[in-house]
Amino acid sequence: MKKRHLLSLLALGISTACYGETYPAPIGPSQSDFGGVGLLQTPTARMAREGELSLNYRDNDQYRYYSASVQLFPWLETTLRYTDVRTRQYSSVEAFSGDQTYKDKAFDLKLRLWEESYWLPQVAVGARDIGGTGLFDAEYLVASKAWGPFDFTLGLGWGYLGTSGNVKNPLCSASDKYCYRDNSYKQAGSIDGSQMFHGPASLFGGVEYQTPWQPLRLKLEYEGNNYQQDFAGKLEQKSKFNVGAIYRVTDWADVNLSYERGNTFMFGVTLRTNFNDLRPSYNDNARPQYQPQPQDAILQHSVVANQLTLLKYNAGLADPQIQAKGDTLYVTGEQVKYRDSREGIIRANRIVMNDLPDGIKTIRITENRLNMPQVTTETDVASLKNHLAGEPLGHETTLAQKRVEPVVPQSTEQGWYIDKSRFDFHIDPVLNQSVGGPENFYMYQLGVMGTADLWLTDHLLTTGSLFANLANNYDKFNYTNPPQDSHLPRVRTHVREYVQNDVYVNNLQANYFQHLGNGFYGQVYGGYLETMFGGAGAEVLYRPLDSNWAFGLDANYVKQRDWRSAKDMMKFTDYSVKTGHLTAYWTPSFAQDVLVKASVGQYLAGDKGGTLEIAKRFDSGVVVGGYATITNVSKEEYGEGDFTKGVYVSVPLDLFSSGPTRSRAAIGWTPLTRDGGQQLGRKFQLYDMTSDRSVNFR
């Protein structure tokens, strides 16, 4: 009887430990040493919240891991990583890389196959070091199941995760080819799926425990790597069990300490934010109160002057115009203040409703961009009046408002406007960065860019920008020779010579913009179009209003700018090329926050092919995207990297500014700059200039 009571008490204690309220809910998945949600050396099937960005640093005697992990979708995790191999030099040539240690770059993906249920675990499949050198490449299938404060994981790994070979590769039963894996190191940037899930396989697993003290979590794992093939050298492994602790300092920071291989300490830090949760915190003028004043059919000059001022400074409409025609009031202007133009429409409607001319039944607000009309928002006055005055509870109606093709009436006697500013000048800070170079891991250039715009007519714009260097560490550049593994024209690999000039004209050009009607827009341009090329070109875009697709075509003839000095950059070399692309834009109906962009055409090196770009927009307006270009240039002719690819993050500056703004800043990462698959960097692209024609993607 006593034994039975003892077992009952033990079972009750376990049940209480697993389900009692003394154990708080886990505060979210944690990052592994390699970046991405996991235990220590091994991954789990868990995913972070959609939009989560984690910046990670881990350090031990042999390696430093720098990684950035983004949860693009609830089912897809992406990770970029640089591994500093502390025991190896970048190269054996001191004049080339000095005493810098070897840096290996990698890209990882993890895909959730299904979510956890009451009985079934969450399951994911993933791959590490895709398109890298193969130093740390691995594939895995992993399952995770929570039980109270414990989260258990069991997985099967190949490659770096499976070198101990503690189980037979199950795929060997399908074909003997899966029993062998080529472990020779590959050329960086090459994507070779032929070795995936090949070679020795190992089981791995572990548990993460949420302690009663919520900031603290403990980890225990069993790993399948034997460290006998590590690039840092054969590493002693006294134990296959690793233990660690993670402490959440704040909502946005974790610190980590672990003891791995039975002989090595690892420590690190994780900084995080969520792109879906970021919100602007600027101070802004309040929306105008609805205080209607009776007006005659023709507005008084003092009244309309006040309206125009409010439209410009409160509603954010630059160059505002007001015009009455029949029973319709027309308002036009360019939204330069609010990223979400709906806010500007709300404010503009209130402004004109407070002093609405007698007899007006409809308000039409047309938004312009670069003097090209984009969209007209048409609102019924009676419906708007009811909404602004307030409707009885239970009797609310839908505002009678719709977006239509831009309507711009001919000038009448009842028209008022604020004179357009034909000239604009501004200075912006510029930070150019390069990560992973041979001379220094981090290269930077801090400078300022002065930009001047002058409208010669309503459609003809002249614009130029001058860059001035303030500080950089480009004195470390000591290698500007052409790539030895490629014979393509050097359309981009002269970048080091260009940026070493302290002052240079970045661009100087003339643009003619025209709204062609029925969803068509066009531009022609000529001059110094970007840092490395000048010439002339044209673009036409067909973008139906609020459609989830669009098509564009651009054609250009350009010559390469000289790079030898700032003065020589105003001259051209003998190299010229015709370049242009047919581009399709698509926002899937099942994923309104995703933009797919596909281009085909001829690139700057004369190669022909296509580019696929996919971008995800989060609730905050942050956009994360990636692209890849394949052309008719062979891998051997292209050189290291095989093809052009990269990722970028575009951040709306109103998340950090003291006031609303439509400006954005972009950060890009390209594993390696080569000459194949390179597009012309045009300052104005019509799809970006017509973003107000879409209610979904801005």
Curated annotation (Swiss-Prot):
Lipid-anchored residues (N-palmitoyl cysteine): 18
Record organism: Escherichia coli (strain K12)
Protein name per Swiss-Prot or TrEMBL: Uncharacterized lipoprotein YjbH
Signal peptide stretch: 1-17
Family: To E.coli YmcA.
Compartments reported by the entry: Cell membrane
InterPro entries in the record: YbjH
Principal subcellular localization: membrane
Covalently attached lipid (S-diacylglycerol cysteine), positions: 18
Annotated GO CC locations: plasma membrane
Keywords: Cell membrane, Lipoprotein, Membrane, Palmitate, Signal
Originating gene: yjbH
Topology within the bilayer: Lipid-anchor
